[in-house]
């Protein structure tokens, strides 16, 4: 039992060090992770190899021009680049808002592409869309860091 308690104590010390490290670095890691996702997805659209390209075209062809996917790709790359640069981060967040709202558009315009059985059984495309809720939460965390809290 004594051995276990010693090992447990050592584990807790390591866990505490990791927790302190994450307290300092986790938002930076989150910023770069979201930026990487946006740059990657944007490049896929830019080069015409995005797995959701057809869904984007189908859900926007009634309102946006044919080359919109390329513009969207550039838009997403800008979001990613701006999130990497602290002085431009707020612009990345502002660009993110209409982009992420647009990602939910197929739920309205093409529900048959998003659901096997409405409202709970999703297609692969539906999964792809709903995972954007995680990106929304991540960007909310990033946005919360734009201003330092003043001591009161």
Language-model features: where?
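Membrane-interface extramembranous regions
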Residues: 1-152
